[in-house]
Each structure stands twice: as C-alpha cells, then as structure tokens.
C-alpha cells in the first residue's frame, strides 16, 4: 500500500549551512518555479549568517558566514518522499554570492532566491509550492496557518513538521504599512525559511467573500517564516514574522545578486 504524503510536505527542503566543513546552522527552504526556472527560497539571515537589521554575525562565537548549503531534495526516479542530499556553493572566495535579494529593499526583506543549475534540476523531482493551492482564499487576522519546517532537523524521513499558528496582525497592511505579517506560534531556529500556508477544510471563503464547498482541503501559500520577533526574554512573546509571498517573484524578476 503506497504511503499517502501531503503534497505540501514535498515542497520543503531541510538545509544545513556550513563554512567549508564547519557546521554553522540548520534551517528550512522550499522550491519555487518561475519562467521555467527553479529556485530555492529561504531567509537572508540563513545564507548570510548575519542579522538583517544590525548586520552583526548571528554566531557570536565563530562569526562564520556560510559558503556552502547542503539540502535534502526529492530525487527523480524513486518513490515519493525519497530524499537526495545535494551541496550548493552559495559564496565564492571573491565574496560573490549565489542568492538574489529584493531589488528595492534588499536585505530588509529577509528572503532570498537561489537559482538552481540545470545539472541539479535534471536529477531532482521538484514540487514548487507556487504551483499548488488556491490563490483566491481569503486571508484574515485570527485565521489558523501552518509553518512547515524542521525544528529538530530532517529526522528519518526528511519531511517537515507542520507547526500550527494563527495570524496575529492585519494581513492587508502588507506591503503598504508593514513588510511582514505576524503569526502567533512557538518555534525553534530550524524553522527559519519555512513556507507558511493557510489550509481550510470542506467550506472555503474566497477573497470576494464567496463561499465554496469541496470534499477536501483548500490551501494558500501566504509567505516565508523568518523566526520570532526579538525580545529580552524568549518567553515574552511567541510571535513570528512571515514575509509576504508577493516578494518572491519581485526578487526573482529583479535579478539583484548581492555582493557578500
């Protein structure tokens, strides 16, 4: 009997960031398709090793900046869910980096797109998240969402944990007033870079306030999780930031490759 794996669980990629062979951090990424090209999406702070607000190194002990990314991708020609390790060089000795940043806000949008080469694309079974779901679902404050990531690493399967949360700020303020939506959820560092989806069952409301009924779930990708808001005490507020999904196409179309 074949395993029933949710298609959204196949969109994510557990990643390890390293400087040569020195481990720096673990995080989450996911795949995206645009103009017949494939990209890996994650946070700027993951690949740079620096805080986007202060530009300080996140690792206070080593001040290391990643130059390699190791990810577990779905492999072509294997059973669904079988993962294949791939190493991507994300920074050259010259300082040139592989990732694209937002053309206007740059690192102030904590999201990057890493173009994936043809040799990698030929061996990977891609499940780009922007080719799934229903873009017309209504998104409002108080609704439940799921953060799909790896708080404890890839585990035995390489499939993500679905961490439940709720939208804690007005989503319509993005991007006019705020650059991100707040979500109420407890998370761990390995969740940085996770896709966040809205999922409703059976009865669904569209942006035009029309009600539809289906026998299963409807889904909408709403953005990229980048961790909790900084507070003096990590227990003070379990509030995280989700950068709007609309930024991803802007990053790819802008084609701005940041110098490290």
Question: Where are the regions that the model predicts?
Answer:
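Long protein-protein interaction modules used by eukaryotic assembly/scaffold proteins
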Residues: 2-7, 32
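Compact nucleic-acid interaction/catalytic patches
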Residues: 48-58
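Serine endopeptidase catalytic core focused on the charge-relay Asp
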Residues: 10-17, 25-26, 33-35, 56-178, ...
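C-terminal subregion of chymotrypsin/trypsin-like serine protease catalytic domains
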Residues: 5-8, 46, 198-260
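Activation segment
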Residues: 50-51, 171, 252
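Primarily extracytoplasmic ectodomains and periplasmic/lumenal surface modules that are beta-strand-rich
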Residues: 36-39, 47-49
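Cytochrome P450 catalytic-core helices
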Residues: 42
């Amino acid at each position: 009997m074949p395993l029933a794996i949710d298609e959204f669980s196949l969109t994510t990629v557990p990643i390890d960031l390293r400087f040569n062979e020195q481990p720096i951090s673990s995080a989450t990424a996911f795949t995206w398709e645009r103009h017949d090209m494939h990209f890996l999406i994650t946070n700027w702070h993951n690949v740079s090793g620096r805080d986007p607000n202060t530009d300080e190194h996140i690792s206070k002990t080593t001040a290391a900046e990643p130059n390699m990314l190791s990810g577990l991708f779905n492999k072509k020609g294997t059973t669904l869910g079988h993962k294949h390790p791939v190493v991507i060089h994300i920074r050259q000795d010259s300082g040139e980096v592989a990732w694209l940043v937002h053309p206007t806000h740059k690192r102030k949008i904590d999201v990057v797109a890493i173009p994936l080469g043809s040799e990698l694309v030929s061996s990977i079974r891609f499940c780009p998240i922007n080719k799934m779901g229903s873009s017309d679902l209504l998104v409002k404050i108080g609704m439940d969402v799921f953060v799909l990531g790896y708080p404890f690493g890839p585990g035995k399967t390489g499939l993500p944990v679905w961490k439940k949360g709720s939208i804690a700020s007005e989503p319509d303020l993005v991007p006019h007033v705020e650059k991100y939506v707040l979500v109420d959820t407890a998370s761990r560092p390995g969740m940085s870079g996770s896709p966040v989806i809205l999922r409703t069952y059976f009865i669904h409301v569209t942006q035009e306030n029309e009600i539809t009924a289906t026998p299963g779930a409807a889904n909408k990708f709403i953005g990229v999780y980048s961790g909790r808001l900084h507070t003096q005490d990590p227990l003070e507020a379990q509030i995280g930031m989700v950068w709007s999904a609309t930024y991803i196409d802007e990053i790819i179309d802008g084609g701005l490759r940041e110098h490290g």
